[in-house]
Amino acid sequence: MPRVYIGRLSYNVREKDIQRFFSGYGRLLGIDLKNGYGFVEFEDSRDADDAVYELNGKELCGERVIVEHARGPRRDRDGYSYGSRSGGGGYSSRRTSGRDKYGPPVRTEFRLIVENLSSRCSWQDLKDFMRQAGEVTYADAHKERTNEGVIEFRSYSDMKRALDKLDGTEINGRNIRLIEDKPRTSHRRSYSGSRSRSRSRRRSRSRSRRSSRSRSRSISKSRSRSRSRSKGRSRSRSKGRKSRSKSKSKPKSDRGSRSRSRSRSKDEYEKSRSRSRSRSRSPKENGKGDIKSKSRSRSQSRSDSPLPAPPSKARSVSPPPKRASRSHSRSRSKSRSRSRSSSRD
């Protein structure tokens, strides 16, 4: 069961006075009075918290008493063992911090900013003062700014009551000013912000995935283009080799067919040259005649032209003189055979 320590008690205090002092804060299970101090046992821990929050520093029988949560190992049924303190009484010399005394703070969205706060006013004093309006779950003083505090309530009605009732009241010689903190008043906004952040993160992730996909697609397209170019080049080379082998394997073709093939190769070669010139000139007219465009136009002209380069002409032209020599040798052999036949006759 929760116990509350009462210090600085008058020696004339009786149990009836303690019951009156704690009336309105729940059911009391037991009262243990000592010389100058005592303990009160509550049925509910919430009632004990409320009593500590509101009754600490209040007057009882002409004395400002200390009301705090009792801490320490229990010796017997009558009470707890506390270290000695100067001035008598069994209050512990190891005083607890304010946060331990008042319990863990609970953050809510019903928040008020307290301005013009006295520098002597601590967060405990501010919390005790604000409990007149309702249940206070969180309090801070001079944390972010000097002469400014923060109060958070359990419900919106408590916050509204404090705003209407305690705005302009005096604490430690200063009239405080209460302002509702609107950005923190609704968790829905924060939830929507977190949702929008998650949505933006999802969008950014999807965008990054799309960009990576488009990059991979562009890379695959460029690879397929380079492969098609290399295939075109290899095909053109193979075609050139085939044409060379055909020209070598058919030395007995007529002169007319040779002239036709020469004229065709010349025409197509001139066409490919004109195409490459027009493609290489077009970027210069647009103001972007770079070296890369020239190399591309050359590679495209090479892949577009199925026939081989001019050197094939020299190889295809080379066979005629051999045939001329063969015809000369045939005429000589014929003349020799005629002369032999005439000599025999």
UniProtKB/Swiss-Prot annotation:
Stored PROSITE patterns: RRM
A matching Pfam family: RRM_1
Region (Disordered): 75-102, 176-345
Main function: Plays a role in constitutive splicing and modulates the selection of alternative splice sites. Plays a role in the alternative splicing of MAPT/Tau exon 10. Binds to alternative exons of TNC pre-mRNA and promotes the expression of alternatively spliced TNC. Plays a role in wound healing and in the regulation of keratinocyte differentiation and proliferation via its role in alternative splicing.
Domain spans labelled RRM: 1-72, 110-183
One GO MF term: RNA binding
Biased composition (Basic residues): 185-250, 323-345
Segments of skewed composition (Basic and acidic residues): 264-273, 282-293
Residues carrying N6-acetyllysine: K165
Post-translational modification: Extensively phosphorylated on serine residues in the RS domain. Phosphorylated by DYRK1A, probably in the RS domain. Phosphorylation by DYRK1A modulates alternative splice site selection and inhibits the expression of MAPT/Tau exon 10.
Disulfide bond annotation, renumbered to this chain: none
GO CC annotation terms, alphabetical: cytoplasm; nuclear speck; nucleus
Subunit structure: Binds SREK1/SFRS12. Interacts with DYRK1A.
Signal sequence extent: none
Name of the molecule in the record: Serine/arginine-rich splicing factor 6
Organism for this UniProt entry: Bos taurus (Bovine)
Taxonomic placement: Eukaryota, Metazoa, Chordata, Craniata, Vertebrata
Gene coding for it: SRSF6
InterPro entries (UniProt xref): Nucleotide-bd_a/b_plait_sf, RBD_domain_sf, RRM_dom, RRT5_SRSF_SR
Modified residues (Phosphoserine): S45, S81, S84, S299, S301, S305, S316, S318
Record bears the keyword Lipid metabolism: no
Cross-referenced Gene3D superfamilies: 3.30.70.330
Location of the protein in the cell: Nucleus; Nucleus speckle
A biological process from GO: mRNA splice site recognition
Keyword field: Acetylation, Isopeptide bond, mRNA processing, mRNA splicing, Nucleus, Phosphoprotein, Repeat, Repressor, RNA-binding, Ubl conjugation
Cross-link (Glycyl lysine isopeptide (Lys-Gly) (interchain with G-Cter in SUMO2)): K182
Entry keyword annotation includes Iron: no
Family: Belongs to the splicing factor SR family.
